Amino acid sequence: MKLMDRDAALQDLLEKHVFTEWIHDLALIENNFLTRQQAIEDELIAALESLCQLATLQHEQGRKGDIRYIYISLLRTRVVKNKAVYRIDAYDENWFLDETECAVEWSADFVFEPLFNRMTKLEKLKSDYARKITTMDIEQIQQIEAVKYHLLTVEFLKSQMPVFIASPSLERMPKANACTIFAGEYRDDSEILCRFTRSEGAETREGESSWIISS
């Protein structure tokens, strides 16, 4: 390999081993999902139901109000450790000022595994660049690439909202008149997955609530 300065070495690495490689990962992600589809879907719903049960318990203990927000957040600090962990939080009307923590974790490794495997290979390739590329560079590349995989995860989360909305645990959980589910990064940018609002004046059976679902 010809001698390169740091910028040239980094550009060479990106062009040869990063920029388009994520496209090849799509087939791997699809295969991961189809191989374990039922288990993957069940694990997400189980995590969400566990959150609802915890929020219901805290409400019964007088420690938390009616739930108004649910956040599903990628933990960037875990990505560095090759773990695709999402934290799922339930907040009452106090939002981030809600003092009673109500959170569970869920793993999206089935989406991120190809990324982690690629980054392991990049770590080995850096020796080809005569110390111009560092482990810190690889970690930064990983964080940038993670955005693509996070977006794929968000699409999966959206697809599972109808199942979650129909779950008994969510129905039993005390909710504000308007409740919104978000996905994003922890206490950072996020997008709405689903919003449900209590319907005023709708005919319901005794003990039931009527909700208007929107996305």
Q: Residue locations for each model-derived region?
A:
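Short, amphipathic alpha-helical segments
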Residues: 1-39, 108-122
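Conserved aromatic-histidine-acidic binding/catalytic patches
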Residues: 32, 36-43, 141, 145-153
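Generic structural hydrophobic/aromatic packing signal, biased to beta-strands
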Residues: 44, 72, 88, 157, ...
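Low-complexity, serine/threonine/proline-enriched polar segments
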Residues: 102-144
